């Protein structure tokens, strides 16, 4: 049986929201909500938080996750790769779950893990694209081939529909990833790509170097906390009832 670990990168010094992982959300640190959702996903054997901050590490352990202290890293994926090397027992599949997704649905994680079957080395999620999202650069779009592997990710409207409107093939990317343990280390060691730099999308590095990314469908829309205002929205959603 393959061993699946969810590793959550978290840092204290986010520019737009310093201390975000420890911000209070319904009486708990934000990072505790992410840990709890990850632990509820079936098929997950271990949940760990990768951080360079002792305060975040303590909050992670209090929430039931392993805390792995890492050095300063240029990206969250670099931090996850370092943590995966330190995690024992070693995982076969690593899920990179952002530490600012307190409403992540356990079913979305389960869908992602299932997508890693059949020799897939990297996978991610996508959902239907809403018409009002077509021109929004903060909503990343993805198009796939007939096998469900990504052809391209872009902040631009793709695919272009000559007749106008939103193509039925258009999907919005949900930024959670799974890797085989071996490919995670390979990916982290790859030099950044030109398209990655142009779009500011790290996943394009894999495509530029000739690797495939399996894209699985999900109903989860994604809800990242980037600002204090986002946190207020999350508080309102939790007060209205937990998303199951």
Curated annotation (Swiss-Prot):
It is an enzyme of class 2 (transferase). One of its GO terms (cellular component) is cytosol. Its EC number is 2.7.7.38. One of its GO terms (biological process) is lipopolysaccharide biosynthetic process. The keyword Transferase applies. Keywords: Cytoplasm, Lipopolysaccharide biosynthesis, Nucleotidyltransferase, Transferase. Pfam families: CTP_transf_3. It is found in: Cytoplasm. One of its GO terms (molecular function) is 3-deoxy-manno-octulosonate cytidylyltransferase activity. Belongs to the KdsB family. Activates KDO (a required 8-carbon sugar) for incorporation into bacterial lipopolysaccharide in Gram-negative bacteria. This is 3-deoxy-manno-octulosonate cytidylyltransferase.
């Amino acid at each position: 049986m393959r061993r699946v670990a969810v590793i959550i990168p978290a840092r204290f010094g986010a520019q737009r929201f310093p201390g975000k992982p420890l911000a209070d959300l319904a009486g708990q640190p934000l990072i505790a909500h992410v840990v709890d959702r990850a632990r509820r996903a079936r098929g997950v054997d271990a949940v760990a938080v990768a951080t360079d901050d002792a305060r975040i590490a303590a909050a992670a352990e209090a929430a039931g996750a392993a805390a792995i202290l890492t050095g300063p890293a240029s990206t969250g994926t670099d931090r996850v790769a370092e943590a995966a090397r330190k995690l024992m027992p070693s995982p076969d599949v690593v899920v990179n779950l952002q530490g600012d997704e307190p409403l992540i649905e356990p079913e979305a994680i389960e869908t992602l893990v299932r997508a890693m079957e059949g020799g897939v080395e990297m996978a991610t999620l996508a959902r239907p694209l809403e018409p009002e999202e077509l021109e929004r650069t903060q909503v990343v779009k993805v198009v796939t081939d007939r096998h469900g592997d990504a052809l391209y990710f872009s902040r631009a409207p793709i695919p272009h529909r000559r007749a106008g409107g939103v193509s039925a093939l258009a999907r919005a990317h949900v930024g959670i990833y799974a890797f085989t343990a071996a490919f995670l280390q390979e990916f982290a060691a790859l030099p950044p790509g030109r398209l990655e730099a142009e779009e500011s999308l790290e996943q394009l590095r894999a495509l530029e170097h000739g690797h495939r990314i399996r894209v699985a469908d999900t109903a989860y829309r994604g809800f990242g906390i980037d600002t204090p205002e986002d946190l207020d929205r999350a508080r309102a959603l939790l007060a209205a009832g937990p998303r199951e």
